[in-house]
Amino acid sequence: MALIRILRCGVTGSLGFGLICLACLFAGDAAYSTDSPDEMFLNGLQGNWMMVGTLGGKSVRYRADGERVLQGGFLKLHMIDIDSPPQYEADAFLGFDPKAGDYIAHWLDRFGAAGARVIGQGKRNGEQLVISFPYADGAFRDTFTWRPATKSWALLLESQASNGAWSTFASYTLTHRALQ
């Protein structure tokens, strides 16, 4: 009702409407802060990375690029293997929900929509973030660990068997790479 009154006031209404738009813009920014420790943790994944490790016991190498997207609401980690043509490509979207006090993750890859139905949730403890994905065929657990001494990340992907036992699916180390 107040907005309608402001709009009916002509020039003053335009000014009032502009002020309301600015207030909404700043209120939206207040909900997302890159300064919180949880957002700063995700910010550590920004940049260009070489991702080396094992997948199913075989050596693999990927390029990974981390950047803030969707007006900073998510950290996107784009991963693509260095084979030509690439055999695997994925985007992981990681975000922190300050109201719930947890992280959420969407893992989208070349295998399509079926795997994208599941949203991962997790908690951070110090330099380690563990995200669980409750897939119908068995849960997955992704553990991101920041290693300050080497300025690198470890990423451990584990799958859960029907008996509840966890096993390593993939393991990677991410180190900064120079742009070419």
Predicted features and spans:
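Bacterial N-terminal signal peptides
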Residues: 10-27
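Residue-level detector of intrinsically disordered, flexible termini
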Residues: 1, 22, 26-30, 91
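N-terminal secretory signal peptides that target proteins for export/translocation
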Residues: 1-9
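Hydrophobic small-molecule pocket/channel-lining residues, especially in calycin-type beta-barrels
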Residues: 30-180
